[in-house]
Curated annotation (Swiss-Prot):
Superkingdom of this protein's organism: Eukaryota
Protein name in the entry: Glutathione exchanger 2
Gene giving rise to this polypeptide: GEX2
Residues that span the membrane, as ranges: 59-79, 121-141, 153-173, 217-237, 276-296, 308-328, 344-364, 384-404, 408-428, 441-461, 472-492, 549-569
Species per Swiss-Prot/TrEMBL record: Saccharomyces cerevisiae (strain ATCC 204508 / S288c) (Baker's yeast)
Subcellular location: Cell membrane; Vacuole membrane
Functional description taken from the UniProt entry: Proton/glutathione antiporter that imports glutathione from the vacuole and exports it through the plasma membrane. Involved in resistance to oxidative stress and modulation of the PKA pathway.
């Protein structure tokens, strides 16, 4: 494997030696001379560093350090998603769990683009360190929060750090691997999920989050940064090694000659390069539309509140303003329409959106559903929630080797979507009661296989469709669509929950005070009313009713999910970091093979022509 993971280093070095000629062609190609050259130099630095990873020991070190970093991120995320439920429960606002999730996802939409674009300009490592600082700040604020608004504010900082570290870790692994082995490298940070599901439940039980959730979150302010140190030191060492090469010195000398512009020019460049106006418009728009859906419920008659209505209308207007800005004024639009017009780009992005939409709509309230309506312990519930990650992580090395052999991914994504349909059907059938244990486990296993076949495969397909200069941007857009799907999915599930659950609890319990407790603090409720009690049975029936609605919506959304998979292109995963030949405007030009619907249509035409000729 070692001889083919990164590709032919001699080709990379020869390309680097031609950098001066390319710069001369590009330096005056448009008004953004500073942006062109600075971005170009950072990408070339990555290519020189990539050549240093040709040695087997450095490849092993890269994968190992990514594993350690991924372990810190993944274990914290797994535990914190549970601790968030206990935090909202302590505020007696557990029903607003999805509101926190929506706020996280909305913030992610804008931050993904910022990280991806700045990483081309300032380098991956610098942005990785910035993301780590946000991560620590958010963790500290969340741990000290005494009310939901303060916890949500901490979630903004934490989520900026979380999505940044994930995105930049993906970009770092992509820079230093070939397309053929890209899947293997990217899954290295995911392998900790082989271990996490079996220890997270025990950790949660031992940590007693109902009383100690604040300290349980706070400890990650120093545990997580420790997990990032190995990969940070490795990149710094490889940068030191690269600085000793003639190519690096030549590139730095040329960079000093080409450096132009002062502070004002840099700020103007960043304003247009990041599309600050576009980011603000889409972030505020989504916040105005999605967050009120999880806040309004019939018990408080908030839908009759003029503030809720005005917020929704404002969000819709801002969204149309965003589209107009992107089409008419943005110099570097968040959604590069020319790039997105090719089905090799828009189809995988559609798959990404519906993949995360269906996941969040089905799993946003899965942990409380397991505890309240399926008689699972906190340990068992945590393991079931994390079972899909375990399945995907365990099978990922074998899947990555298969991908390296076949070098194609489209059929895998189609199979993953089909598995999602089966998974959602099982979640619909086994949505509550003592007989749901085995069915939910089966659904979780299939969900893991679906995630394995879809999620990272779509990232690699998109990276295979673009050049190195566009790789970070298109990866950032993919992450943005994933968070957009997550935001809307969490918002829809939250809206259904807040609109339906209170009435069902009032109806089945027949006691307004008891219904309020069951709705606002379900974990407290189940400790007072054991399994089999009439009150608990009434709550279980309410949960089953609401889950039926949520899973019906999720099952319906697998149809457009499957449709988008049919239109994807199927680029070959070559033994280089990206396709650089046969490109146009940063997009790889592939033979315009027909999508599967066109092929089916052609097949029916062929059959009809045969029948006519037979007559």
């Amino acid at each position: 494997m070692s001889s083919s993971v990164v590709g032919a280093s001699s080709n990379k070095k020869s390309g680097i030696r031609q950098s001066c000629e390319i710069i001369e062609r590009e330096r005056h190609s448009n008004d953004d001379t500073y942006s062109m050259t600075s971005t170009f130099f950072k990408l070339k630095e990555n290519e020189i560093m990539s050549a240093q990873f040709d040695s087997l020991k450095y490849k092993i070190l890269l994968i190992s350090t990514a594993f350690v970093c991924g372990f810190g991120i993944s274990l914290d995320y797994t535990l914190r998603s549970t601790y968030t439920g206990y935090a909202t429960n302590s505020y007696s606002e557990h029903s607003l769990l999805s509101t926190v999730q929506v706020i996280n996802a909305v913030v992610s939409v804008g931050s993904q683009v910022v990280y991806s674009r700045l990483s081309d300009h300032f380098g991956r490592l610098r942005l990785f360190l910035v993301a780590t600082i946000f991560y620590i700040m958010g963790t500290i604020i969340q741990s000290q929060a005494t009310r939901l608004t303060m916890y949500a504010a901490g979630s903004v900082f934490y989520n900026c750090g979380y999505v940044g570290t994930n995105l930049l870790l993906t970009l770092i692994l992509s820079d230093f691997s070939s397309l053929k082995w890209r899947m293997f490298y990217q899954y290295a940070s995911y392998w900790p999920y082989i271990i996490i599901p079996w220890i997270s439940g025990n950790i949660i039980t031992a940590a007693n989050p109902q009383k100690n959730w604040s300290w349980n979150i706070a400890m990650w302010a120093f545990i997580y940064p420790l997990s990032t140190l190995p990969i940070i030191f490795l990149i710094l060492y490889m940068k030191y090694k690269s600085s000793k090469t003639a190519e690096w010195r030549s590139l730095k000398e040329q960079a000093r000659k080409e450096r132009t512009g002062g502070l004002f020019e840099n700020l103007v460049f960043l304003f247009w390069k990041l599309d600050i106006v576009g980011i603000l418009l889409i972030t505020v728009s989504l916040g105005c539309i999605l967050v009120p859906l999880t806040l309004a419920n019939e018990t408080s008659q908030k839908w009759h509140n003029s503030k809720i209505i005005a917020t929704l209308v404002s969000g819709g207007c801002l969204f149309f303003i965003f589209l107009y800005w992107e089409a008419k004024f943005a110099k570097s639009p968040l959604l590069p329409f020319k790039l997105l017009s090719d089905r090799g780009i828009w189809a995988p992005l559609g798959v990404t959106f519906f993949n995360f939409f269906t996941f969040f709509i089905s799993c946003d309230y899965l942990y409380p559903v397991l505890l309240v309506s399926m008689k699972e312990s906190s340990t068992s519930a945590a393991r079931i929630v994390n079972l899909p990650d375990f399945v995907a992580a365990t099978a990922s090395p074998f899947y990555s080797l298969l991908v390296a052999k076949t070098r194609k991914l489209k059929l895998s994504v189609i199979g993953g979507c089909a598995a999602w349909m089966v998974c959602m059907g099982l979640f619909y059938k086994y949505r509550g009661g003592s007989g749901s244990h085995e069915g939910v486990i089966a659904a979780s296993v299939i969900m893991g296989l679906s995630g394995l076949l879809c999620s990272n495969s779509v990232i690699v397909i998109l990276q295979a469709m673009t050049t190195h200069s566009r790789m970070a941007v298109i990866t950032g857009i993919q992450y943005t669509f994933s968070k957009l799907g997550a935001a809307i999915g969490a918002s829809v599930s939250g809206a259904i929950w807040t609109q339906t659950m209170p009435n069902q609890l009032y109806k089945n319990l027949g006691n307004d005070t008891l219904a309020e407790i069951a709705y606002a603090s379900p974990y407290t409720f189940i400790s007072d009313y054991p399994w089999g009690s009439p009150e608990r049975d009434a709550v279980v029936e309410s949960y089953r009713y609401v889950q039926r609605i949520i899973m019906t919506v999720g099952l319906a959304c697998t149809v457009p999910f499957f449709t988008f998979t049919m239109f994807m292109r199927n680029p070959e995963l070559i033994d280089k970091a990206t396709h650089e030949e046969f490109t146009e405007d940063g997009l790889v030009v592939l033979p315009d093979e027909e999508n599967i619907f066109s092929q089916i249509k052609a097949l029916f035409r062929h059959n009809r022509s045969n029948k006519k000729s037979g007559c």
